[in-house]
């Protein structure tokens, strides 16, 4: 039997000081050494609406752990709000914060010898950072998120009633046809409650994917932050972590550990879900990074193969009119997985923290199945309250009926899919030798094949200026480079350029190609993650104004239509003078420079490139050798 990790600090005469400190922190003497210590990694902050309500959540989870016989020890991580950090120097810190979060959890868990972990996450880089930590540590772990916010609704001056989200406010801000009065109304109502932004943006995409990976309970990704059903989820998470902790330490059952649950097959299932629901392109970056931490040989090529086979079953904002509350009403993630299972697109023997197999838990939680549990039916009736509130589980509204329409409802079946291939596509070609990613679900059909002349910007700021000044016209391919993990550094999201294109009426006639990334709220012909990035000597560094570029999503190609010899000549010149932007002044802190020194391109998940393991580093400490799954 594996010993409790916490015995390192709770047993032995030499640990009298550690035990004294545990008593001083409120642990009863009788519990020290007798009960497992569960680290509760919270991410409460008043900066982020997706996290403002998490302060009491840590206490609820902790109380559930205590009732089940554990010792909860809560601590906090940082949480960057990408929406507030967007469009200025702050966005440079977003992706690097993922690694900082992962490292901080590792530091706390390892320094205090915790036996298990609960991750209370919600927004863009927090769930991925916690996922990296869970894969790295490989101790019993359960994820539970803060939940999505309710969708906004507003009546405009002309009497039109609109459903709103954050992206509406951003795009309408640069739409000259939108009056100041209407913009003020939109701004006031776009984000009416606490929770992660209401569409299928990065935060909600990742919270849904941890359900598919098997590390969270059903309903984690779609139950609204304001609903009382969310409180039940927190209490269940506390009980679940204690159940799997006992299975591991008392019964030597290693099948409950994160790497056993999040196997290669589970990552494949998560990617299938992502493709079916048209999730954020950022999920590709984060799943690749998490697989790397798990020691799995799961690459962009695997995602590319999956993208050609899995159909798109769901279109949620920004790809369509539905919001997360609509996905929940239609049965949530279990319903999407159920449709994929019936279509033969899932590995069904994978485990979860709450079930021995995917088949087993879908039989209970898929409300479209023949005999769903009453608990599932009740959960997916949870509806928005329609009242402005920053308070968690403050309302208990219910839908009159579920959306079980598999032909034209929020979640379709395979026979009525939006497309036969998924909502994301991996493109390759001389402009992206190692790959690029596009959210194809958000691209109008008439833009799936596009050729245009390049307008080159060497920063997001320069790209915004190009759009607002009229330099970008219909038929343009706006190339934004030196914004990759190393070149930015930090791989900024290009939400403002795409939002401004939309606001200026250019989203249907302009493509954007970048080695940076896009917000989960981006739509249109937006191709990101171009690898190798410009700072790593990728072909994108050789593009000049006026070069023709061809994008062919059906053929999965991205080409710079310039002679190979000319490309080689330009890159050779760049090598001599250095792969760096010529027209950008961007002062960098020590923290950002350190990140840039280690960051790899997006096709590797933006993970850190470390020197050979001469000191018995992470590979030795956590046994992260590559495994087949």
UniProtKB/Swiss-Prot annotation:
Protein's pathway: Amino-acid biosynthesis; L-isoleucine biosynthesis; L-isoleucine from 2-oxobutanoate: step 3/4; Amino-acid biosynthesis; L-valine biosynthesis; L-valine from pyruvate: step 3/4
Single Gene Ontology MF annotation: magnesium ion binding
A Gene Ontology BP annotation from the UniProt entry: isoleucine biosynthetic process
Modified sites of kind N6-carboxylysine: 125
Lineage: superkingdom: Bacteria
A cellular-component GO term for this protein: cytosol
Pfam families documented for this protein: ILV_EDD_C, ILVD_EDD_N
Cofactor: [2Fe-2S] cluster; Mg(2+)
Subunit structure and binding partners: Homodimer.
Similarity annotation: Belongs to the IlvD/Edd family.
Function: Functions in the biosynthesis of branched-chain amino acids. Catalyzes the dehydration of (2R,3R)-2,3-dihydroxy-3-methylpentanoate (2,3-dihydroxy-3-methylvalerate) into 2-oxo-3-methylpentanoate (2-oxo-3-methylvalerate) and of (2R)-2,3-dihydroxy-3-methylbutanoate (2,3-dihydroxyisovalerate) into 2-oxo-3-methylbutanoate (2-oxoisovalerate), the penultimate precursor to L-isoleucine and L-valine, respectively.
Protein name listed in UniProt: Dihydroxy-acid dehydratase 2
Organism: Nocardia farcinica (strain IFM 10152)
